[in-house]
């Protein structure tokens, strides 16, 4: 009886294993969840970011030689897919209607430490990413610009 009770509890509490297919988001329904920095914010943070001696000693001063390079790097806002599963930092210089009209151009899977990233690429360097500890696979040989529906990934235990 005790074993039966344990088995029932384990079946209801433990996550169910199995692969789930994930599709890259349609950007027409993407939502901006972060705000774009003001010019004053960028100028203020440029001074602080580029005056960090540790960064200079590591030789990481590329964006500190020109404010426009720094602005290009830091003038971004956080966006999410409509369901909140994918997110991206998108340049605030990219018009919203251009972002929302962007079509999927590629999909790939990458590892970063113990995390797996499913990276969906769009024009203008836009990349929406899904992060998970699960194992994911994607067919990188598919041309997503021709048939976006064929660009899927399979992730163990994905939402």
Residue ranges and their predicted role:
Residues 3, 17, 121:
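Residue-level signal for functionally critical sites in structured catalytic/ligand-binding pockets
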Residues 3-14:
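Sec-dependent N-terminal signal peptides
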Residues 20-159:
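Mitochondrial intermembrane space
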């Amino acid at each position: 009886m005790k074993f039966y009770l344990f088995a029932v509890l384990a079946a209801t509490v433990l996550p169910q294993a199995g692969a789930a297919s994930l599709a890259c988001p349609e950007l027409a329904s993407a939502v901006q969840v972060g705000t774009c920095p003001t010019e004053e914010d960028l100028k203020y943070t440029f001074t602080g970011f580029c005056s960090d001696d540790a960064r200079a000693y590591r030789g990481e001063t590329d964006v500190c030689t020109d404010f426009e390079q720094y602005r290009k790097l830091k003038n971004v806002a956080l966006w999410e897919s409509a369901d909140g599963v994918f997110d991206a930092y998108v340049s605030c210089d990219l018009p919203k209607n251009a972002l929302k009209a962007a079509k999927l151009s590629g999909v790939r899977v990458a590892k970063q430490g113990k995390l797996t990233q499913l990276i969906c690429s769009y024009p203008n360097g836009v990349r929406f990413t899904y992060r998970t500890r699960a194992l994911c696979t994607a067919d990188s040989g598919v041309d997503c610009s021709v048939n976006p529906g064929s660009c899927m990934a399979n992730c163990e235990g994905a939402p």
